[in-house]
Amino acid sequence: MVIASGDRVSTFRDFCEALRQHRDDYIILLVDSEGPVGKSPWQHLAERVGDQWRRPDAVADDQAQLMVEVMESWFFADKAALIAYYGQGFLGNSLPGQTNIELISKQDVFRALEHASQHAQKGRYRKTAHGFDLIEKIDPVRLRAASPHAARLFEEDRD
């Protein structure tokens, strides 16, 4: 089960609360890295300005998972799904050609989505209107191939 919590602070707070309330379940924190990652996820979250999150006691290393650099990066793993979702007017050929989507900066991800979707049937990309619909359409096999951190997440899939 995936529970979207909203902003980063709420997500971490909800993760910690879920750990307390569901001690027998394997709870995973999944957040945007918001930048390049050169360390373990918990170390990245502990050192990231704005987070400084301490790994809770009795929580395994693999219970922190990152979308590098942002959730929207994952869309580029399956450009066919993006093109099908937005329909006519979507400029799929203008998307970055990088095969490792984690190497595309957050700024370039949003710039490319904005440009490619500007004349699309669904209109310009908006996270609240399009983000969660789109993420459901991404092929997990393509995502694992394009993102080492997504591959790590799927390796840890417990159910």
Give the location of each predicted region.
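C-terminal accessory helical subdomains adjacent to catalytic cores in phosphodiester-
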Residues: 1, 9-159
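RNase H-like polynucleotidyl transferase catalytic core
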Residues: 5
